[in-house]
């Protein structure tokens, strides 16, 4: 059903995220923390901007590839006797809506640690709360006309909201100039 296809779709998106977004975010956090502790904000911003560019450079083509070849990816990874063509097609719509948000989720995995590196967990937490509320509201609005696709789209919109607020908060911090 819808719950299962959402779960399969999200797992596939998380697989893609785990390959590069989580890896890059995990690798740069200690370096960002060290630069922030030494108040080397020029180097801090250079590293953060480079990570953002790399993330966009990877995420955008992966998103397009996934949108075009999503059916083949889902079939390759999940199709079996119990996961038939109908399951593939149900998962495909949700997967496409999830993948539209890949760039935003990937950027959030890079930008949020930049705040943590500066010992500022409040702003990414606030952005997360705002996006969580947005996710619930958009899911409630979109679930009836779009079913599971609406829930997946709501998550993408919420991820975009989170990214926007993280960038707004970065602009307000003197130490972050991205």
Locate the predicted segments by residue.
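Membrane-embedded alpha-helical bundles of multi-pass transporters/translocases
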Residues: 1-178
């Amino acid at each position: 059903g819808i719950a299962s296809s959402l779960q399969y779709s999200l797992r596939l998106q998380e697989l893609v995220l785990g390959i590069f977004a989580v890896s890059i975010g995990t690798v740069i956090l200690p370096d960002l923390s060290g630069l922030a502790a030494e108040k080397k904000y020029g180097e801090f911003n250079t590293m953060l901007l480079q990570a953002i560019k790399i993330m966009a450079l990877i995420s955008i083509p992966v998103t397009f590839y996934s949108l075009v070849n999503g059916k083949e990816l889902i079939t390759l990874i999940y199709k079996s006797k119990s996961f038939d063509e109908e399951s593939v097609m149900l998962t495909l719509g949700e997967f496409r809506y999830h993948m539209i948000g890949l760039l935003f989720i990937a950027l959030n995995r890079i930008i949020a640690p930049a705040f943590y590196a500066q010992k500022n967990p409040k702003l990414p937490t606030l952005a997360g709360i705002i996006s969580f509320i947005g996710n619930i509201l958009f899911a409630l609005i979109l679930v009836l006309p779009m079913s599971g696709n609406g829930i997946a789209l709501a998550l993408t919109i919420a991820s975009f909201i989170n990214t926007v607020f993280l960038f707004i908060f970065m602009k307000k911090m003197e130490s972050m100039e991205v």
